A protein has these predicted regions:
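Glycine-rich beta-strand-to-loop/alpha-helix junction loops that act as flexible
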Residues: 54-58
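Structured mid-to-C-terminal alpha-helical surface segments
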Residues: 1-52, 64-68, 79-341
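Betabetaalpha-Me/HNH-type nuclease active-site subdomain
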Residues: 61
Length: 341
């Protein structure tokens, strides 16, 4: 990949443009995809490799090929299992204890991002890119790369969103490649990137429980949440993945239990995010916002043949019925906080 970076800018511009033409994508998206893969390669070659796991939309797209939307950022789980805060978490009890743990965990994360993550990123970026922490988001590292192509909505920066409030297991090792290497393998013969990522089954149940929570939301849908509805349906279209997820209902319980502790909100109703009481269909009061958000996302981030929102909702209704028809299990804790009120 470094050989490609060292090519004259005119050659890189032509290769990126031709790749974009083949894939019917914007050149700026192909260019950013290259730099996302480069950052991931350097990240998982660095001393940080054993401290982070790749997750989120970019992971679903690049690692598993489950979604077709262009994802720009890199979501990372930061391992806190060996941190002192674990003892406090394990002994915490009640609302006050949980709040103390959340505050301590947020503080620990900010310290790790500034003291460990940023220096390591700056080290591998060298003079190629610049890395910094935005003042208002201390849990984020922004990497600015040297762009060739301009875009109205694709920023020439990669956002590393780092946080410990996600389960470490199950995870898997995978190899990814930038779009350029897939189209012109002879030009990037060192483009294979090894990453460690959240399992697709866990990602499926994570997304499903997001929709369950949104179905109970008393207020308006947050910005950019239409992507979760699209992602769930695209993942469910992968029959093999869906069958594996359905065969591991215990994992759903663990996901819901974890969220009930770390992302507790009375209206989210995570204790009922299980077979027999799962809700995935959006409530009427968020539909208008969902329609606008989906239309915007479809125009900017989805391929031309992306399904309509009506199609998404139709498949979601079927999925809701399927999940509710699964056999419920006794509540399983397995080293995660319980779901008691």
């Amino acid at each position: 990949m470094n050989t490609f970076i060292k090519r004259p800018s005119g050659e890189r511009e032509e290769i990126i443009y031709q790749t974009a033409q083949r894939l019917n994508m914007e050149p700026a998206a192909v260019e950013k995809d290259f730099w996302v893969c480069w950052v991931l390669r350097e990240l998982f070659r660095s001393p940080l490799a054993h401290s982070v796991i790749f997750k989120g939309g970019t992971c679903l797209s690049k690692v598993y090929g489950l979604i077709a939307r262009f994802s720009e950022d890199i979501d990372l789980i930061l391992d806190w299992r060996g941190a002192e805060i674990v003892k406090e978490w394990q002994s915490s009890d009640g609302k006050v204890g949980r709040k103390k743990v959340m505050e301590a965990l947020d503080e620990w994360n900010i310290i790790q991002v500034a003291g460990t993550i940023l220096p390591a990123v700056q080290q591998f970026c060298g003079e190629l890119c610049s890395a910094s922490i935005p003042e208002k988001t201390p849990e984020v590292v922004l990497i600015n790369y040297p762009r060739i192509f301009e875009s109205a909505y694709i920023r020439p920066e990669i956002k590393l969103e780092i946080g410990p409030k996600a389960a470490w297991d199950p995870n898997e090792a995978h190899i990814i490649k930038p779009y350029i290497a897939e189209q012109y393998p002879h030009l990037l013969n060192d483009a294979e990137v090894m990453v460690r990522a959240t399992s697709a089954e866990r990602a499926f149940w994570e997304k499903v429980t997001i929709l369950h929570a949104q179905a109970q939301r008393p207020s308006e849908l947050p910005e950019r949440y239409a992507r979760h509805y699209y992602d769930v349906v695209m993942m469910a279209r992968n029959i093999a993945l869906k069958q594996r997820a359905y065969a591991d209902v215990e994992l759903l319980y663990r996901v819901a239990s974890f969220k009930h502790y770390f992302y507790r909100a009375g209206w989210a109703d995570y204790p009922n995010a299980k077979p027999g009481s799962m809700h995935l269909m959006p409530d009427g009061h968020i539909m208008e916002k969902l329609r606008l958000d989906y239309a915007s996302m479809k125009a900017e981030m989805l391929p031309a043949d992306a399904p309509s929102l009506e199609c998404i909702l139709g498949e979601l209704k079927t999925l809701e019925a399927e999940v509710n028809a699964l056999k419920p299990l006794p509540l399983h804790i397995s080293n995660y906080p319980d779901m008691q009120p």
